Amino acid sequence: MMVIRPVERSDVSALMQLASKTGGGLTSLPANEATLSARIERAIKTWQGELPKSEQGYVFVLEDSETGTVAGICAIEVAVGLNDPWHNYRVGTLVHASKELNVYNALPTLFLSNDHTGSSELCTLFLDPDWRKEGNGYLLSKSRFMFMAAFRDKFNDKVVAEMRGVIDEHGYSPFWQSLGKRFFSMDFSRADFLCGTGQKAFIAELMPKHPIYTHFLSQEAQDVIGQVHPQTAPARAVLEKEGFRYRNYIDIFDGGPTLECDIDRVRAIRKSRLVEVAEGQPAQGDFPACLVANENYHHFRVVLARTDPATERLILTAAQLDALKCHAGERVRLVRLCAVEKTA
């Protein structure tokens, strides 16, 4: 059974294995053991209440409960940009016009921005390619909404998610090659590694401070602005169906889109509810997959179960209850895994 749980110190080697499979561009999951260990420690201290809000971040893993295999990772930053500035570009417009010459040009322009400062961030989503089946990707991504719904006071009103931009298998980023490299004088992979290992001072020191006309970039770079890596397209679709939208903010490195949503408008958060759980044999039928989570802050768990999402009394097997670390008579959080598709 696949289970979402908080990260543990013993997971570092498994996270290193996952990091080696990302193919680059996932800044928050570098293949650096010291950095990953520090990330785990920060998550543990967050759960223990030992960190200020500016440093808090939760990390979860997807585990096969039968074998102990860690198949994926996901995380939430509580409030970005309160310690180090959180940069992105806003894609806007500058108009150059002359009535005398009968010239009017509206030019797409990149403006350096810190507009998302203080927002909660969904980040570090990666599922081992060997485990991309049977709803694991949906479980991994959406489990975070169950945690946010249960512990709403821990998070801010706006949630953002940076999507990985277009990068090829050799680590080549058209956006970086045409823009970032001119200011940073290093390859994308080097800048990505420095950022991922916490060495972010160079961003503020070297970033261009003035607006940049996108027409000055290569056509290849212009074409990838706001576009996602092919492997990230499913993750983007998942978030958009939960209510997230692209509002013309992009990553300063690879040009990937930043999606955002008010936390209380996220479908899985808004529609999740608490129901009593009982032990037994679940009813047979053509039921949809649902997310089921306990309400235990320190021992949070999420699993998938096929059931009626409108039920008031959820029947789970002994194995499912054990995976959730809860008992009959307790209350669990329930929501349909995917939104019901509207038909004409």
Curated annotation (Swiss-Prot):
Active site: H229 (proton donor)
Keywords: Acyltransferase, Arginine metabolism, Transferase
GO biological process: arginine catabolic process to glutamate; arginine catabolic process to succinate
Taxonomic lineage of the native organism: Bacteria, Pseudomonadati, Pseudomonadota, Gammaproteobacteria, Enterobacterales
Tagged with keyword Acyltransferase: yes
The keyword RNA-binding appears for this protein: no
Entry protein name: Arginine N-succinyltransferase
NCBIfam families (UniProt xref): arg_catab_AOST, arg_catab_AstA, PRK10456.1
Binding positions for succinyl-CoA per the UniProt entry: L125
EC assignment: 2.3.1.109
Function of the molecule: Catalyzes the transfer of succinyl-CoA to arginine to produce N(2)-succinylarginine.
Superkingdom classification of source: Bacteria
Family of this protein: Belongs to the arginine N-succinyltransferase family.
Record field: catalytic activity: succinyl-CoA + L-arginine = N(2)-succinyl-L-arginine + CoA + H(+)
Gene Ontology MF term list: arginine N-succinyltransferase activity
Pathway: Amino-acid degradation; L-arginine degradation via AST pathway; L-glutamate and succinate from L-arginine: step 1/5
Enzyme class: transferase
Pfam families, A to Z: AstA (PF04958)
Gene3D superfamilies named in the record: 2.40.40.20, 3.40.630.30
